[in-house]
């Protein structure tokens, strides 16, 4: 299938304009605009590079056909170039297909304990560590915005902000957007004295954090703002003063906490950013609800019947129930080795999108 030339021309022109703009020192005096331009440039760069490779391969193929007409020894080269052109054309067509507009965004991820009491809180902490280790493998930064710990050091709830360090079309959201849902664990709890396997659950909510959250209007009268002492595990990165901030959005009941910034004002600003991202995500979900039932996969309650994945410790097995994915490397997955699973989820999502009318 030939690539849409008109679309390519538009993108090539935009890429050239951005390249000129980014070379202008004046743009970099406005950091927010420069970062936005840099991100867009990074998204276009692989498309432009693939297009240029395709153009070069087509020119080589045309030359090979001309030479093969008089010298059969060039026939094999022409066949290889035909395959190369087809491959690049397919890649470009895929790149030009509609994408999730948030794929380049960073994320905020919440982990909440559910059924299972203390064991559920310990499992929630395992999930948080799993995501932190995955982020570390990719060179991303993780900030713990808030946490409430259990008696045994688990998480009743924890909120993480995960950000990529560079400008890329495939950001944190593109990899981790499928994690929202109920995660079930089957194992012998540390509180179990008779060695019996128990089942408990923890919930994950993940939403994109766009660079600009300007579409959501937040009325100050809809907010209840509380200041409290940090309840985290301590350490240099956690405040021990009364600077932690909890913001409750009364119309929706959404609660956002932030405790790891250096001052109460900074914690409030960060919490407002997270609240804005959550409200924008909810607004987008509602807008898309009539068009697609896909978005219903995000959890609102922590109920084992809504599980998306099971972590079976006795069998070292992980099962993602949405796509039938199974692997017996649970120990590696909990250490952040999630790429194979995320690749499978992305492939299944892409296939589902292609089948939609």
Swiss-Prot record:
Gene3D superfamilies: 3.30.160.20, 3.30.70.1660, 6.10.140.1950. The keyword Cytoplasm applies. The modification N5-methylglutamine is found at residue 236. GO terms for cellular component: cytoplasm. Belongs to the prokaryotic/mitochondrial release factor family. GO terms for molecular function: translation release factor activity, codon specific. Keywords: Cytoplasm, Methylation, Protein biosynthesis. It is found in: Cytoplasm. Methylated by PrmC. Methylation increases the termination efficiency of RF1. This is Peptide chain release factor 1. Peptide chain release factor 1 directs the termination of translation in response to the peptide chain termination codons UAG and UAA. The gene is prfA. Transmembrane segments: none annotated. It comes from the Bacteria. The keyword Protein biosynthesis applies. It comes from Mycobacterium marinum (strain ATCC BAA-535 / M). PROSITE patterns: RF_PROK_I (PS00745).
